[in-house]
Amino acid sequence: DNMKPNLFKFATSELSQDAFILWLLEWADSECATEDKALHETAQEFVRLLLNNKDLEINSVKCKKQEHHIDVFAIVNEEYALIIEDKTNTSEHGNQLKRYSEWVKGKEQYSELDLHCIYYKTGNESYAKLKRLEENYTKEYPEENFSIITREDVLSVLKQSTTTNAIFCDYTEHLQKIQDLTDSYLSLPIKKWSWEAWQGFYMALEKELQTGDWGYVANPSGGFLGFWWNWNSIASNTDVDIYLQLEEKKLCVKSYQKGGVENGYVYSSQLIELAREK
C-alpha cells in the first residue's frame, strides 16, 4: 500500500541503516528466540548470510555500538568478529574497512576472533567499482574474509520472513521499493525513467557487455548519469584515447588526452572527420 507511511522514507541516512542492522543482529541472539520467533529466525539467517555460513548454529550476538567509529561491529558466538561498512547511496572512501580491521586485530580482546569484513550496499553501484573495492581489499589482506552484500542479497533473506514486526516490514518494503524502481527500466518508456531506472539499465548493460563503468558526472547544468566503455588508443597517437559514453538518452564519442589538452582541438577535429567518413 503506497499510502502507508514508511519509517525509512524519512530515516534515509546510513546511521539509520546502521541502527536497523544492529537491531536485527541483536534479534539473532538466542535470548530473543521466544520473543518473536519468526523475526529471530530471520535475524539468524541474516547473520548466516553475512558470515557466508549457511549451517552456522548461532547462540550469541553481541553488538558493539560505535566502537572506534565502526558502522556496525558485532561478536557472534564469541568466535566471529563481524565488521560492516554500511552504505546507502555513497561509495567506499578512505579505506574505512582496512582501518577498522587493523584496529580490531590490534585489540587483545578481539585478536583471536575470526574476522569477517563486509561492505553492505543497499543503493546501486557499478560492478566495476565493487570489483575494484574487493580486489583492493583482498590484495592487501589475502587471508581475511571479505564480502560484498548487496540489496538483492539482503532481500533474498528478508522476504522469506513471516514476521509482522513493523520496523522489519518497513525496512523490507523500503529496499523492495528501491529494487522495483531499479528494475522499472524493463517496463517503462525511456522518457519516464527515474534516476534508479537509469542505474538499473546501466547495471544490465555492464553485465551484458562484461565491460564498462558508470556513475554520476557533475557539470554546471546539474550533472547526469553516464556509462562509458570501449576505450581505445588512436593508433597514430598513444596520448589520446577515444571511448563511447552514454549520457542517459545521448550517445557520445569522447576523446581523452593523457598528456594535457593543448592538442585537444586538433584531435577533436580529426575525430569529427573520421565520424563523417563512417
Predicted regions: what they are:
Residues 69-73, 81-85, 239-243, 250-252:
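Short hydrophobic-acidic sequence motifs that mark active-site Asp/Glu residues
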Residues 44-78, 217-221, 228-237:
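Active-site metal-binding core of divalent-cation-utilizing nuclease and nuclease-like domains
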Residues 21, 72-74, 78-88, 100:
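Conserved catalytic cores of phosphodiester-cleaving nucleases, focusing on short active-site segments
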Residues 95, 99, 105-222:
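Gly/Pro-rich interdomain helix-loop hinge
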Residues 182-278:
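Polyanion-binding interface signature
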Residues 1-49:
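A structured, charge-rich N-terminal accessory region that forms the first stable segment of a protein
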Residues 90-99, 261-267:
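Active-site-adjacent loop/helix micro-motif of nuclease/hydrolase catalytic cores
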Residues 65-67, 76, 87-90, 104, ...:
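Short, flexible loop/turn elements at secondary-structure junctions
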